[in-house]
């Protein structure tokens, strides 16, 4: 999921394909805001993976049918370098475009994504002036802090690329207050695998699982680092320089990028290995006999010592030669990186269950231009 150069198909003053409003332009260039779930939102995760593509280390192929996100409050602020050790601090807002906009990232879009060949992005809106500063033109000599929000679905949202199924799914999102919805199928395709408990019977887990994950995780992403600024030197501890800078009489692209692997991580540390076994272990048959798992099935589940529905300890399973479980325990358990686990605790201070753990990791999935990390502010009860 690294940045690669590519052609950008962009409208300068008119935004087509049903995207949102744009401000009136002056002479300082413009910014095209787009959204992408990268190649993985389009094609999912194969197993075994091709080349160096990401994969689920426990042997699952994961494919998406829909990946709906509600974006809002795309904004620019002054002084992205205000606090070298606190990325969340910036100057005041100088421009903002408001939606909300509903996008199905699985459907892709007409633009080439920031990851290059095979990736797609959908145009959201165009900003052509500092609309919170009297429509002043953008200043090509200034870097602006970039941010956006993922918000609860709303019937008033501008639905940009939803088909009939997407419309129905989005209505469910709005009814339930979900911000993000994953719909898809996981199929176990592991072959040569090892386990920390050879006595455990993995045949007790279903081999095909439908998943439907509706996340209650409104989140603000601010002052994002920007891979497009490379090779500019970032602050210590950061990968890229912060902010976005325009060019005179040209369009600069700012892509809100959603990384789809975050809910499946084994730890809260960024880019952790992905697993599906803990989800499969909680799946239940629906009326048609199909195994289905939702986020509600994760409530009450101890993520530090997973068990299957029969109450048996779930071991680590590795179906990738390069993966070794992170600890020597037979029982699979995930690492919350210092955030306490407390089943009856305050959700603002502790993870109560696997539901909280998954939602927390999912809330970090917003980036700028493929891999630019943003300051994350969770707008729901959650540990910092």
Regions found by a protein language model. Name each.
Residues 1-10:
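Bacterial N-terminal signal peptides that target proteins for export
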Residues 15-18:
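C-terminal motif of bacterial Sec signal peptides marking the signal peptidase cleavage site
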Residues 22-384:
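A short, solvent-exposed, low-complexity linear motif enriched for acidic/polar residues
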